[in-house]
Amino acid sequence: MAGAKEIRTKIASVKNTQKITKAMEMVATSKMRKTQERMAASRPYSETIRKVISHIAKGSIGYKHPFLTERDIKKVGYLVVSTDRGLCGGLNINLFKATLNEFKTWKDKDVSVELGLVGSKGVSFYQNLGLNVRSQVTGLGDNPEMERIVGAVNEMINAFRNGEVDAVYVAYNRFENTMSQKPVIAQLLPLPKLDDDELDTKGSWDYIYEPNPQVLLDSLLVRYLETQVYQAVVDNLASEQAARMVAMKAATDNAGTLIDELQLVYNKARQASITNELNEIVAGAAAI
């Protein structure tokens, strides 16, 4: 029965692991729902600021803000949003692959890349590659605060303003649904133009803005960029929880399958042991 005892111990170990993965799945599900609510709440604010900026920029014929002006690109900046924790499947790896493909494209054009990193997984990955990292933020937790993110964002904004980079992008995982998270790389600076359909020109926008358009655009553009990166962080967090939920469910299901297989092996071992004992009893009786 030594073999059967070892199998029982292994079954107990797998059951304990299954309890842990099931608990992690349930926690990830709860966190994902809360993050989805936060994500939905912040999106209208960001979209409205974007529309106001576009209308002010269109109405201010005599002033062209540097954040809205295209340049010849010699150096680009990327804000890459990754996770602080693992156990979320291939979420980070898929994002890293997408960014590395972009970096290769820029390198082929003799354009250098500088990074601002959010999330410890991204920090360790890109630093190991020896890439130029301007700023980094880690340990944002499950309730990221704008104040923690602003530093990395402003670092890139100032680099663009001072001509140290000629374009800024943000890379993150967009939450599509529970089963799908898509790596996305979006341009932040110079600010892409909105289509007339997105501007919603049916409404009345004949407003007099105070202070003057230049001061207002300066303030709104910085706030908009901070909001966009915050939105990316929240989106990535929802993707992380969804990916972790799926990964832990798969681990729980696999543990259940392994337990069934081990139980079958245990039953066979026990059956063989009982059969041997019966054979010994019968042989002993025959000898008498």
Curated annotation (Swiss-Prot):
Q: Which GO terms describe its molecular function?
A: ATP binding; proton-transporting ATP synthase activity, rotational mechanism
InterPro entries the UniProt entry points to: ATP_synth_F1_ATPase_gsu (IPR035968), ATP_synth_F1_gsu (IPR000131), ATP_synth_F1_gsu_CS (IPR023632)
Q: Which domain of life is it from?
A: Bacteria
CDD domains assigned:
F1-ATPase_gamma
Transmembrane residue ranges: none
User: What keywords does the record list, in alphabetical order?
Assistant: ATP synthesis, Cell inner membrane, Cell membrane, CF(1), Hydrogen ion transport, Ion transport, Membrane, Transport
Instruction: Give the protein family.
Output: Belongs to the ATPase gamma chain family.
Database matches in HAMAP family: ATP_synth_gamma_bact
**What name has this protein been given in UniProt?**
ATP synthase gamma chain
